[in-house]
Amino acid sequence: MENEATVPAGREASMTETNETRRYLVTGRVQGVGFRWFVEHAAVQLGLAGWVRNRADGRVEVLASGPRQKLHDLYVELKKGPRASRVDNVEVEDAAPETNLKSFRIEGTW
């Protein structure tokens, strides 16, 4: 685990909201441009839990859990990316929930 950020007070998902989990695969110029830090910041601001990591194939993988609207908001941010990046595609799929997700963290290359 390289870095871990906790969800700011007041940004936690409401216990009455149903959380969903999504896996995103981001393709383009997304490594070496601060993309993981960009994703971590966006996810924490949205109150999401999960992780982001570089993949050996050049893509960035994101697993995020939270309310459906917040996951959509993250998707919008992923399509933008940080200034130095170029996002060509964002694949999205439902993922099995991971019960140990309490915060959002940056992981190493996988």
From Swiss-Prot:
Residues 21-108 form the Acylphosphatase-like domain. Its EC number is 3.6.1.7. Keywords: Hydrolase. PROSITE patterns: ACYLPHOSPHATASE_1, ACYLPHOSPHATASE_2, ACYLPHOSPHATASE_3. The active site is at R36, N54. InterPro entries: Acylphosphatase (IPR020456), Acylphosphatase-like_dom (IPR001792), Acylphosphatase-like_dom_sf (IPR036046), Acylphosphatase_CS (IPR017968). It comes from the Bacteria. It is an enzyme of class 3 (hydrolase). It catalyses: an acyl phosphate + H2O = a carboxylate + phosphate + H(+). It holds the Pfam family Acylphosphatase. One of its GO terms (molecular function) is acylphosphatase activity. Belongs to the acylphosphatase family. This is Acylphosphatase. It comes from Koribacter versatilis (strain Ellin345).
